[in-house]
């Protein structure tokens, strides 16, 4: 499983953990996802890993995208849709994480491996949203070539490093009420203004709004 400090938890995860808002149990989620993958016949390209905080669906990028592309292949959309059905009846927080190998060459579309992995993550998120997953409980992360599990020294290792991971948190995503703001606190007044400066100059001027 992917290694992150504190199990890869964000502030959202920390909040839900502190409040004990555990989502759907991993055993049930894993069964549903395994059935969806089996029905799609794509077990060769997808595997599932679990750690104390995350249930991770690792999807090989070769199944989802053409080389150096972030557009989901039409043939792969039904696979994502099946996974979405398995995730539709749970309330767990979901992250979509993008990874690449170290062979990407910047082109006119993507500047670097972070850019490519970010766009691929967003593309998968959008497919999940189209399939009915609430966008408010999803987020994307881009790791590019810098958080690989396998060595990039071999073709086999590079192939395994090119992936998108749909990671399901152990904790539920419960939206907190939005706070209504009618006026800015005095010490934050600068945030309502505009920042301006001259090209080539290190001087910055904050122009406060009325």
Give, region by region, the residue ranges found by the protein language model.
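Short, surface-exposed beta-strand segments enriched in small/polar/acidic residues
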Residues: 58-66, 85-116, 139-151
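Short, solvent-exposed beta-strand/turn patches at coil↔beta or beta↔helix junctions
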Residues: 17-24, 52-81, 103-109
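Glycine-rich, phosphate-binding/catalytic loops in enzymes
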Residues: 74-75, 112-113, 183
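Periplasmic OmpA/Pal-like peptidoglycan-binding modules at the C-termini of bacterial envelope proteins
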Residues: 115-210
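Periplasmic peptidoglycan-binding/anchoring modules of Gram-negative envelope and division proteins
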Residues: 26-43, 68-98, 102, 125-129, ...
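Soluble periplasmic/extracytoplasmic beta-strand elements of cell-envelope proteins
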Residues: 45-49, 54-60, 64, 79, ...
């Amino acid at each position: 499983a992917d290694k992150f400090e504190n199990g890869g938890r964000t502030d959202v995860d920390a909040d839900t953990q502190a409040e004990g808002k555990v989502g759907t149990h991993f055993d049930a989620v894993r069964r549903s996802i395994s059935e969806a993958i089996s029905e799609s016949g794509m077990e060769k390209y997808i595997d599932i890993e679990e750690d104390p905080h995350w249930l991770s669906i690792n999807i090989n990028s070769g199944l989802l995208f053409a080389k150096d592309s972030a557009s989901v292949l039409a043939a792969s959309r039904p696979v994502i849709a099946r996974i979405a059905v398995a995730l539709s009846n749970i309330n767990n927080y979901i992250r979509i994480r993008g990874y690449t190998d170290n062979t990407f060459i910047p082109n006119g579309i993507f500047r670097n491996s972070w850019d490519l992995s970010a766009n691929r993550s967003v593309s998968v998120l959008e497919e999940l949203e189209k399939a009915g997953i609430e966008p408010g409980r999803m987020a994307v992360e881009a790791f590019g070539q810098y958080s690989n599990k396998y060595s990039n020294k071999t073709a086999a290792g590079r192939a395994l490093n090119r992936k998108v991971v749909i990671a399901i948190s152990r904790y539920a995503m419960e939206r907190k009420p939005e706070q209504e703001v009618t006026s800015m606190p005095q010490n934050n007044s600068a945030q309502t203004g505009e920042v301006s400066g001259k090209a080539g100059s290190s001087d910055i001027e904050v122009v406060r709004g009325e």
